[in-house]
Structure formats: C-alpha cells, structure tokens
C-alpha cells in the first residue's frame, strides 16, 4: 500500500487504520443490532412456505431483481432507477476496496491491477457521472414535477438518500482527482477516468498541501458516508435496497389463488381466529412486504378504487401498517407500545378503516405494477376474514351469505330451478349430468348464468356454440353450487370451503376431459382455488380452438360501421394471463374493426368488480368505475365495448344507462358476438 494512503497516516498520534477499524466494527455492530430488531418483527409473523420451485424463483430474481424488468413500465422514473441501481452496484466494489485498504486488508488490490483495473476504473468513472446526473434529475423531478403518486410518501427520506448517493460519487471523484494531480501510483491506473479528470480539473489550481487535504478528506468522508448509509437504510423507506431481492425471490409464484386462512392448518375449526387483526397475524413474507415498499406509489396510481376517489390507497395501507409495526417493535425499547394499548388501538377498523378494506375489487392492478412484488390481495382478504368472523361486515352481506349457505347461490333461489333456462332451448338437447355420467366437456354455468336473465343469454350462446361444434357436453344443473369465488374474496372462508367441498364431490362423481366456464371468476376459482386437478378453460380459449381447427366457421359479416374495443376482465387477464385468445377470436370475425384502449391487457382498468360491488357500494367515490372505463372506451372512437365477463357486462350496461349513453355506446359479450356470426 502506498505510504501516504489516508489510513496509513496518524491522527493525534493514532494510526488511521485504527480509526477505520473503529468505524468498521462500530457500524457493523449497529447494523447487526438494527437488522435483529427488524427480524424480531418478521419472526413474529405466521408460517408461510416460500421455497417451492427454486429455479423459477432464481430466474425471477435475475429478471425482476437484477435486470429490473418492471421498472421501465414508468419509463422515465424506471430508467433513472435502473441507472442509480447499477451505478450503486458498480461503485459498491470501489467502496469495499477503499474500506479493505483502510483496514490494511487489501484483498481486492490484486484484482485492481492490470487490464481489469483499467476497464473497471473507466466503468466506475462513467457510472459516477451518470449516477450524479440521474440523482439530480430524480431530485428535480420530485421537486418540480411533483408526481401525485408520491403523495403520502416520506419525501424527505427520498431527497436525503439521493443526496447521500450523490455524495458517495462526489467523494470518490475528488479522492481520485486529487490523487491524479499528486501522481500517486495507486491512482495512476491505465484507462480513461472522466469523473476523476473532471474533479482534477476543478482542483487544478490547488496547492499540493490542499490536494493532500482533499485526498484525505475524500477518503474519510466516503467510508463514513458509506457506513452511515448502511445503517440508515433499515430505518427508512430505503430498507428496500436490502430487502427487495429477498422479497422478489420469495414472491408468490401462482397468480389468481388466495392463501389459506393459515398455512399448514386445513381444518378451520382448529383455528382460534380467522384472518388478520394485528400485524403479527400477517405471514412473515407479508411483513417483509411492508419493509420492502419503496413508496413509489405505482400501486395506488393504478388502483381503480383510488382513481375514482374511494378511500383506498394500497401504498398508504402498507406505509401505515409498517410504521405501526416499527412503533410496536422499535429499535430501542423505551417507546414500546404495551399489549393493552394494542388492544385498544385495533389495526383493522382503526388504523385501516372498513371502507379502505371493502373498497378493493381484488383486480390485481397494484400487484401487477409493483416492481418488488408486494402482495396486497391476500392481505386485504385476510383483513376481511377478520371482519366477517367478528360480524363487522356490511349488513348488506348478511342476506346474500345466508342465501349462499341455504341454497348455494346468492339469489336464494332453489337448486331445482338452476337448469330451468335450458328448457327455452327446445331444439338443443342439454345433458344434465348425474353421478357416473361421462362427457367430453363439462360446462360449469355458475349462479349468474343459471339465474340472472341477462347472463342466461350468454349461457345460451355457449350452449349453441357447443351444439354447433358437435361437442359432447353436459351441465351439473341442480347438483351444481356456486363456485364460491365471490364468497372467498369477501372473506367468508368457511362458507367457501363448504361450497367447494360440495362441488368437488359432484365433480368427482362425473367423468369429463375438461371444464369450461361462463365467467372469469368461476374459471379462476376452479383453476386456482379448487384442490381437484382438472383442465379448466374459459370459453374464449375453448371456442378459439374450435375456430382454429375449423369446427366453427364465422361467416356472417359484422356491420362495418361499428368500431369495437375489447375490455380485459381482471380475472381473465391479470390473474390468469389470457389476453390473446379473446383478441384472436375477435379478429376471426368477418368485417370486425377492433381498436385498443390505452389501458389494456395487464394495465386494464377494472369495471367495478364482480365481487364486493355486487352487494355493497362504497359511498365515497367521485364516479363509478364502469363509467370511467366507458370514458376510456369512447376515447378510442369505438361505439361497441366487448367483454368476456358477465359481471363486466352487468356493470357496463348499467353505467351506459346512468351516463345517458344509450345512443352512443353499446356493450356486448364476446360469446354473443361470436354466435351472431355463425
């Protein structure tokens, strides 16, 4: 090591190495203690198995953690983040090298010589300049642009950390720049050093004594800032710098499904309570989610409930619960909240209001947008489970849930009338399956297709299509219960289990190759919630295959004056990744002109939900979701909105009437449109 390295000098008679060791040991001890206190909170969480499919998790870690695939969904902010992230990674090696030299353990020195040193130093210097520009741009963007999605975030922390990162770049630039002017061997590496040379240009008028002071000060400020930054991270929203990669690795792999009431416990009667009331009722992974939130606001910016003025912000729920957790398990114990105080200050119904919890449509837009894979729906449903269990649910649910329990449908209609709609199809025989019957395709109609007159027309269209394609099919009729999708997502886990068990028993009694469904909600719950392995298809997938195989041939030309746009249902698109099948089916219809809305595919805007909104409306909202979605459809120039979900159809038809758009807009189900061309 060069004899005049800052750590080799003495200060007040004490070797610089001793000061470096003091800073190093003190910082690591403090950092370990802070992490331990954070671990205490995670350890208080419930069991959650997250070690399945290691290969898939590692691939996701690379794709979403290192490559940061989701960041550019917000292009400008995403590019800035990627630049700062990778600059921090590249400069991290430099900081470690400086610290190791200061500890007189220069294990990286052999690597920092020769050809690699020239390459690395050039790369490092380039990144220092780029990161400085990116930090400045990020600060100006926040200060001048003031994006709405940052409202409620800890703004000071964002500015402070950006300044710390920039300061790390500047201290190294001036450390190297002064070394270049002093011509120290350790710094005169072969290679282009733009950042160091820029600093040297700034310092070019300084005396040798001043340069030596800058060199020494640059070193000590750099390592002190590095360790201060390290310890500040777990105390701020930038804890995600440490927790983001683990959170992405332990992410939920399967979309559409919900976690059980408690992992590892199948019998609900074994549980003392259902759902979540306190932070320790969440799973350890969900608590890690709270630590990992970057407060970027992408979740709330894409939340349809938030967009129409409902009192729901996924970001603010995360921030509020995280901050309350920090108060409950603080770094130092003198402000620890007592158990008695926790009992009188409930999280659900207190910190998080009932309207926040019931405003969610479980559309998944927040989870689709989150760059660090925070899970919101499971948390919301867990809190609903607590409200249902303690009878704090909206009173409008009571009668509907009683109907589900007594009759297996939300209307309270007898099971004997579940298949009455098929009687109107006198020319088409519909087989009602009994135990032991066998068909190629089982059509699971579900409750709205069975009882609601408007949705029965969609079910009839599906039956007509099956008949025209000469498919051997049948329905369960009176033996079918509601799929339970809505029941589970409003938090009535016990009732869902009952409906599911009765349906599974009936399904096991029949033989079939595949199941098709009317709506994406039943499709999702049969595919992702039911334990019975079976091939489950939404009708759009099924009938597209029939068209592509030539078993169905659309021939009637659609009116060329009409312009169509397709609305992606949440539980078909985001939750199950089915975007192309409905569009390919539409493109197969002769004469149809299709245009896309700006918010489509995985950024589709929820219609209002096929779950809660069916039986409970939130008073605090500026407009209905379906009306806002209709505005988006009209902006494309379309006059016909196509959907593949009966609940979307119900909401859009109602919104067209309330908005007075009967002469301008029309909504049609994809299946009805297909049948009109056959």
Predicted regions and their residues:
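Membrane-interface segments at loop-to-transmembrane junctions
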Residues: 50-51, 55, 73-78, 112-123, ...
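Juxtamembrane/interface segments at transmembrane-helix termini
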Residues: 31-49, 100-105, 137-155, 173-189, ...
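Alpha-helical membrane-embedded segments
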Residues: 23-30, 132, 166-167, 212-249
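Ferredoxin-type iron-sulfur electron-transfer modules and their immediate structural context
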Residues: 230-359
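Hydrophobic alpha-helical membrane-insertion segments
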Residues: 82-94, 160-185
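Iron-sulfur cluster-binding electron-transfer modules in prokaryotic oxidoreductases
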Residues: 199-210, 258-260, 265-271, 376-678
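Membrane-interfacial helical/loop segments at transmembrane boundaries in membrane proteins
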Residues: 1-9, 101-119, 178-213
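Iron-sulfur-cluster electron-transfer modules
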Residues: 2-137, 144, 281-290, 312-316, ...
